[in-house]
């Protein structure tokens, strides 16, 4: 039996395709024939018909056909399926033989060629005698044939050739050798495929006809054989549905066979073959659930058919192969588009195959454990005459014997012994590892991390059994991280134990030390006596001695390992092993904790390192080092205790570096921070604990940061969630879970002992020089020096505020854009204890809104810390939010000379510009001066002098000015005419004289200016008196370039009598004036309506009386009639 006997035959696993042989092609020396052959077999696409082609010589001897039985009455079959039958029909017996022959229809020597072709066909038929194989002829021609019916000669000669060769017309083909050769070949293939299907259909009918002669008493094996053949021929015919149906029938028939120890292997072998075919076809038909159901049924039926107890490993091997084959089928189906899921993927089948392979290994170990004196049987009972078995699943020493009684027990024993001795030479671990590797790949693909880790552990253990310790260690080390992170401590302990054995057998010092450290720790579930043994071995290694062998190791491997350890001892030297503990769980726990999250630079930095041992016995360490991100401090945090190597495990509890199991040891450190580290974070980068002597072998346990290992985070989480009350400890003892790691602290500046006061009058007014008085007083006990002031806008605010805020120390001049928003490091001298100073800062805010201002005072002072004098830079800052507001609101109005509101003004007609300045400041404002700057399009009617100089405005008070202006010409109606600017110079009433006034420029609004065709103004006294004549003179001026026809009328009033023209029509020349004189005679006192003047311009109908009344008065105050006072009246009064 060879180790590969359990592999399925290649012909069973391949896809059956119709077998067609091509004869008459010289593919070596004839280029045309080579091109034809390449077109048949090279680069075949999936859409071409499934045919297997083979080039054979014309006189090739095909397998002889055995004589057909006419009766099965006395026939007793020797087995189910011959080992060569599938290969015979796949590769030896063709469904069709194609004879290629070069012959054109116009061949001059037609008769000779025809005869030669017929001879070749006859030779092929002779070699196929007794077979139903079809024969076809293909004529290779140089010319492209004419369409059917057009070439009479071709038709005649084709019929003659078919007659001579005894062929039907469907078996003669023409192949022109042209540029379209591949197209012709594909058409030929399709025709060949039809012939092949006919052949396989005939074979199926032939096999079915044999079944009529069978009986179930003596021909049970033939029922299975014939059903398998029918299914196989159906596959060759590509009728997969019928093939599946017949395979299912064959499978059921197999399990109907009487099973005995002598034929159980044959039954299982055939059941395995047929099951493979059924599952393959189910996957091919895209019915994976049917395939899975069939496989489960197959396993349930066969798993208890073990056979001979002495060959139990064979059953395990067979079971392993079943699962592996199904896994391969499943994986192949997935590659072709099938979708698998986490709970149903090929990995489970590979895993089960590995399980049975392991079972095979165990059985082989138990059954094949013969003495070395036992010799292999001679002659070899496993050898056959032909070198192969006649029937699948039979024993070589009793082929074709179907009797359940063993005729030769001695030969049977020899055969079993030969199989057992062969099995002993099988490397089972390689088989198991290959299957586990396949399973791991599948579980990784389908994201099943725990299954993957579980199988990787098994792989590692299998490598250990195979004595490949390097690979075992690599795999086990890889999966340990997962088990640590998920706290599978029992599993982790088992893996660590195997890893420790590997590292011992390879004499890997660092790995041996690392795994020993972890097996001694709290994550290990080993008993104390086992831990004590490991601890003792660890100390032996540190003392440069060989450790004791690990239990249950291979004897030969232990001897090799002891030599390796001896070599390690002879190479004694300074061996320091740095082991980072963040990725595993050592037997010592470490936590570092600063006393506070921050320390002032004039206070010593203090922190504690807490250590706790989990090993069985007290242990003494030699040195503790704490490292920081600033390495200057490392020298201050070293604790070293001299001890001999032999004292490491002595029961000594004295000394700071001796750790008692379960007790927390606190080690305190302090140092003075550097002044340049103010504002920086000091971090503990690592804590190193030395075990052993640095002069010999030494282990350095290195914790990153403030401590903690692979299990710390999970333990802290469990402790936080736990409601269990902590046990009371003695006063000098510390509960480990109550210690929280604090691995960093901040160095902050010394607490300043000065006071900073700000004096100001908020809110600030926009654009004024706002005064901030900063008072600094020292309360230090010693002089301070290098006092510096930083004042201005606090950084980090809106960029627009930065651009519109300017700070200066000189208030006598206004700030411009060149001044900064923040004045930094202004030297203000030194201060003695109790002394104070003042500094005035001026701020100009160009926009309204809130601003945060910063005042920062820094100074230097000498102080003593832990006997060392240091120079401390102290600082104190204060911030204040100041609101900036508008100092006043300015309202501008355009009115007529009658103080009526104007929407627009008229060219050359005077109007009034009125300004109202309303104080919005909570403080009194002094208006230093005001100025009206007119645009070129405006002129003043009189001198523009300020009317509000030196006016002081309280909150809510207003000051008004009035200016008489004239617009010489009309402007753009849409945009209006620019008026100019109104400039107000002002400052707070409370500021000193040296502070400059602020000039606020208000841009006056544009006004629409229009031309008027006729301007009318009136000259009349300011008042009248009852019954006294009141002369009124109206002036009419033509403002156009046209002669104006004017109709004038006066409407009387009840309060007046008048004399003058009541109605007149006149003409006014361009640019000239016309006067109209009236005498009004008032009749009543008080404000009285004047007689209304109405003007109608014939050329300008839009000129209305309503517009006219804007220019002339419509009423006047009339005083009552006066009388002379007599002296008596006066006296009486």
From Swiss-Prot:
GO cellular component, one term: TRAPPIII protein complex
Subcellular location as annotated: Golgi apparatus; Golgi apparatus, cis-Golgi network
Name of this chain's protein: Trafficking protein particle complex subunit 11
BP GO annotations: constitutive secretory pathway; COPII vesicle coating; endoplasmic reticulum to Golgi vesicle-mediated transport; Golgi organization; regulation of protein complex stability; vesicle tethering
Keywords: Acetylation, ER-Golgi transport, Golgi apparatus, Transport
Phylogenetic lineage: Eukaryota, Metazoa, Chordata, Craniata, Vertebrata
InterPro entries: TPC11 (IPR021773), TRAPPC11_C (IPR025876)
Function statement: Involved in endoplasmic reticulum to Golgi apparatus trafficking at a very early stage.
Family of this protein: Belongs to the TRAPPC11 family.
Main location: Golgi
Subunit structure: Component of the multisubunit TRAPP (transport protein particle) complex, which includes at least TRAPPC2, TRAPPC2L, TRAPPC3, TRAPPC3L, TRAPPC4, TRAPPC5, TRAPPC8, TRAPPC9, TRAPPC10, TRAPPC11 and TRAPPC12.
Taxonomic source organism: Mus musculus (Mouse)
UniProt modified residues of type N6-acetyllysine: 245
